[in-house]
């Protein structure tokens, strides 16, 4: 029994010593004869890639047309493209010329370089105003119309003799003359200000000489009183 009980303890002791012992030194030549040496190459493959396939739809050959028809169609397309480019260039030049004919404020400049006048242009120019957009430099130099132009436009739109609808209605409804409506607080303030001005009117009428004379008299009386008090104290 004692020997059987001692055997597990000996096994545990030997296992503990086995774990505690250092491993054997690494030998790179020990496993060379056990199997073939494998080399993994991650570079580009040396085999050529598979041939390119265009697919089932593109693999069908397209029958070529005759050389004469192809050249004629190409010439027609190039001629139409040249005509379209010429028309675009012509329209662009016309728009530039129209933009140069107008002043900085979008008004038609006079030939004598006078201040800008109101826009008086032929119908064809006014029709193309939206198409002739200004450039960046012209937009940056854009200025509002002058004060004289604004006053002239307002005077032409509404004459000075004509009255507004509200003014006409007010003149028609007004019968006899009525005094203007005054707020009670404003009336009280005005009366108090008038009363205060009337109370202080004599002093303002006397001027600065009366006030100075009064102060001088008070000063002399005060000096006399002080002298009398000092004399009596001694």
From Swiss-Prot:
Keywords: Host Golgi apparatus, Host membrane, Membrane, Transmembrane, Transmembrane helix. The keyword Membrane applies. The chain crosses the membrane at residues 211-231. It is a single-pass membrane protein. Disulfide bonds: none annotated. This is Protein UL56. Its main location: host cell. Pfam families: Herpes_UL56 (PF04534). One of its GO terms (cellular component) is host cell Golgi membrane. The keyword Transmembrane applies. Belongs to the herpesviridae UL56 family. Residues 1-104, 158-182 are annotated as: Disordered. Plays a role in the transport and release of virions form the host cytoplasm to the extracellular space. Relocalizes host NEDD4, a cytosolic E3 ligase, to cytoplasmic vesicles. It is found in: Host Golgi apparatus membrane. Late-budding domains (L domains) are short sequence motifs essential for viral particle budding. They recruit proteins of the host ESCRT machinery (Endosomal Sorting Complex Required for Transport) or ESCRT-associated proteins. UL56 contains three L domains: the PPXY motifs which are involved in the interaction with ITCH, a member of the NEDD4 family. A motif (PPXY motif) lies at residues 23-26, 49-52, 144-147. Residues 85-99 have a biased composition (Basic residues).
């Amino acid at each position: 029994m004692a020997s059987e009980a001692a055997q597990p303890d000996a096994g545990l002791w030997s296992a503990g010593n086995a774990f505690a012992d250092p491993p054997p030194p690494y030998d790179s030549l020990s496993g060379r004869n056990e199997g073939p040496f494998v080399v993994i190459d991650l570079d580009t493959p040396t085999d050529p890639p598979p041939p390119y396939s265009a697919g089932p739809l593109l693999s069908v050959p397209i029958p070529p047309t005759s050389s004469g028809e192809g050249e004629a169609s190409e010439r027609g397309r190039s001629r139409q493209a040249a005509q379209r480019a010429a028309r675009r260039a012509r329209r662009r030049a016309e728009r530039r010329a129209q933009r140069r004919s107008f002043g900085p404020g979008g008004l038609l400049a006079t030939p004598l370089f006078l201040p800008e006048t109101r826009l008086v242009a032929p119908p064809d120019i006014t029709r193309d105003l939206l198409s002739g957009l200004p450039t960046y430099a012209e937009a940056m130099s854009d200025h509002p119309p002058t004060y004289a132009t604004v006053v002239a436009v307002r005077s032409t739109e509404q004459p000075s003799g004509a009255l507004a609808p509200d003014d006409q209605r007010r003149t028609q409804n007004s019968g006899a003359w009525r005094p203007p409506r005054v707020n009670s607080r404003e009336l009280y303030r005005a009366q108090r200000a008038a009363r205060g001005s009337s109370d202080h009117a004599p002093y303002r009428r006397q001027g600065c000489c009366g006030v100075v004379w009064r102060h001088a008299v008070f000063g002399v009386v005060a000096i006399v009183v002080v002298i009398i008090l000092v004399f009596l104290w001694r």
